[in-house]
Amino acid sequence: DKVSTSIDFIFPIAADDLERIFNTPLENPNFIASWTTTPWTLPGNLALTINDEFIYDLIEIEFDKKKMNIVLAKDLIESTLERIGISEYKTLGSCEGHKFLGLKAKHPYLDRSSLIIAGDHVTTEAGTGIVHTAPGHGLEDYAVSKENGLEVLSPVKANGTFNDDVDHFAGLFVFKANENIVELLKENGVLLSESSYEHSYPHCWRHRTPVMFRATPQWFISMSSKDLLEKSINSVDGIRWEPAWGEARMQSMLETRPDWCISRQRSWGVPIALLVHNETGEIHPHTQQIIEQVATLVEKKGIQAWHDVEISDLIDDAEDYEKITDCLDVWFDSGVTHACVLDVNEDLQFPADLYLEGSDQHRGWFQSSLLTSIAMKDVSPYKTVLTHGFVVDSEGKKMSK
């Protein structure tokens, strides 16, 4: 669990838009209210996400001795006003959530707008029913923003500080910027409440510290290109599964899997030997030959060869390109053993008679082996897959580690 700064804050919105969808004349300043436990993500806000099946009310309140109109999900009015410390309000109108779609509110402190979009992840469990959405700071935010054609704005560097072009907070470590952001909202008159909130939050398994969600460019294998996923799913039926339930397990995991992110940012591992253009980000047109060159070097000198080789040793237009420093996903490494073990040993045969591992490998080795083999050879790398259990100690903990 983590104790976070939770805030209710508001986005100004044009009276004309609200008068039209609520069908009522308005006199006070108008706002849409949102709630978050991550104020540091506000520099990345580009949207407000509603649930298009909810009912939203426009209510009049008096806050800080001023009257204002705010939009809230009908089912969350009471809990929101309790956080703000207000007991009295007047309902000015109600409307379905879908009527807000496409409208724009003004960012709480930046000179830009926030598009109102819809997402199924918006619930009435907490908050206001309107989710502040930063495409670069969370999987749900990223997905719903991509669906609506929004830029993936990720204004945070790899060291956890804001980019140099972030107004007000450039260079600040993001978690330490919470106080500054809350103070700025207060100065702009758009902060309604602030409190401590204890909740479950992802932590690094190794360091036990809270993680920071940050969208970064990565390399993917497309599941739809050349029907890779469809072919992989169709191949499952021709494999023998022991126990038999392994077939349904693999089938269901494949049916819901996204594109495969194969890049990792680590100091160890098999490098992704790509050169990309400094301006366009496109890979070099002679990538196949470059990879062959690098592979030959690695066979002679080891993995370090990629880091040591100069770009000018590989291509003539070296000044236009830069090396990728990412490493391959380890599941890609292990997943191609059918090629780098079976194919190069005359005493072995392809496909393998048997792959065997624990049940967690339907998502790991079994799956990565199947996908890479279908991509490379159009056939499964194994005839039979055996899933075994785990030996555990007296407390039920597995002993494999």
Q: Which role does the model predict for each range below?
A:
Residues 139-144, 368-377:
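Alpha-helical support elements that line or immediately flank enzyme active sites
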Residues 47, 54-130, 139-143:
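Protease-associated
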Residues 1-43, 63, 99-106, 112, ...:
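Residue patterns forming the tRNA-binding/recognition surfaces of aminoacyl-tRNA synthetases
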Residues 274-320:
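Glycine-rich (often Gly-Gly/Gly-Pro-rich) flexible segments and glycine-rich loop motifs
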Residues 109-117, 323-352, 383:
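Active-site-adjacent "gating/activation" loops or surface patches in catalytic cores
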Residues 146-155, 183-193, 265, 316-322, ...:
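Secondary-structure transition/capping motifs at alpha-helix termini
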Residues 133-136, 175, 322-326, 347-357, ...:
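Conserved phosphate-binding loops in nucleotide/dinucleotide-binding enzymes
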Residues 253-258, 263-275, 306-314, 322-331, ...:
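Catalytic cores of enzymes that engage adenine nucleotides and/or redox cofactors via long glycine-rich
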